[in-house]
């Protein structure tokens, strides 16, 4: 069967109680394509997960933006995968570029997190992507492959994994990633999965685009054959997120 | 992003003002009072309990809990009879703060276990100080040994976190402490003072700071820290503050013990002159034991 379009909204370190209420209201009232066509996940900060989970329409799922690498215990400040499961939070974003660069998360650490989260029953949005320096040195696929390998060495079942490609080189650098550039990496990554994991995993795993996605460019990106959806940043806090979700219909057109 | 709720900010600011007034009232009026004997200093501290010298007990739940276990613990805490002259704070994981805030008695304040170093924004997985204020969280634990040694947070990063949190009116439990290898190399005070210096380089107003000494050397190493060993470090830290910050800050600030504290040893620890309370680990997950630890403030009074 075809890969179901996937749209995740990463709110990052944003939101107040009032803003969260407004965003949830927009999401609850928005006209969105059916769950047969698109899978939608939103990812608030930890402190807002319970309220979003309780107020959000059931067709839209909730994700945490991170979790701890192993079982909970003496790890002050961390939230464990089993805590998320206990609160019925089904998804988690792991290996986001901001955590790799600002919090020093290594490929192996991210791989261990993905494996542990899956072992506890979470579904994972696993992020990969290269910096400007890496791209300009011609290392794009080497970097993305190494990041993906650190995950594939630690897991067997990819059913509950969505891979998000973040063109870090185009985030805050003044560069703009074109849909063709996104497609090129997605295609390369899918080929890597086919060669290093299996043809079945390559065919069934959703590879979503985690670059700058807006109401204006979402349809063109969605039309690319190996772009299976988005991990949306700032636009996920705005009404245009509804339009981005509905770009899923481009795939069935 | 939008500024935190003006109501919450204003409320916390007023609390901060009251605390600052308390500090001034508690400070020695004349230099010669600094030479007061031990028993007189203890008596003074009891009298000053209405100010910032008040006994302080924080419960750090760490990365523990389920919806049900949190509910049970909150019920136990709500049912406990707590002594009046002690500040009590609990620190649930981020994901349970909402549940705790909605069900716990307001006699007990709530802390986060960590916070981001600056304003919120593109920092996936982090929580900002503005967000803590927005959800009614009054405190944050910073520099905990598990974040220093497991996560890799360095002194300067932690110092900047403290400065930013305070600037947003979040009160700070600032943690310091040395590893076993550091202690055995005779570097206890070097390490603690270096950690203190990183806080002092960043903090300008200490009114909303509590210092927690964690004898990391006795955590999971088979060693046991005695009340005398705790007192020795607490007294040295207070002296360091007196020399490097000011005598007023040194006398007004709470220095709490973050080693292994339980219902059996809390009374003995509380009697030590420079131990102003506790940052409790595992025992804070047991409601009745934690209440006993909170109420060990009475041992402080007996000692005085």
UniProtKB/Swiss-Prot annotation, chain A:
It is found in: Cytoplasm. Keywords: Cytoplasm, Gluconeogenesis, Glycolysis, Isomerase. GO terms for biological process: gluconeogenesis; glyceraldehyde-3-phosphate biosynthetic process; glycerol catabolic process; glycolytic process. GO terms for molecular function: triose-phosphate isomerase activity. Substrate binds at residues 10, 12. Pathway: Carbohydrate biosynthesis; gluconeogenesis; Carbohydrate degradation; glycolysis; D-glyceraldehyde 3-phosphate from glycerone phosphate: step 1/1. The active site is at residues 96, 166. It catalyses: D-glyceraldehyde 3-phosphate = dihydroxyacetone phosphate. Transmembrane segments: none annotated. Its main location: cytoplasm. Homodimer. Belongs to the triosephosphate isomerase family. In plants, there are two types of TPIS, cytosolic and plastid. This is Triosephosphate isomerase, cytosolic. The lineage of its organism: Eukaryota, Viridiplantae, Streptophyta, Embryophyta, Tracheophyta.
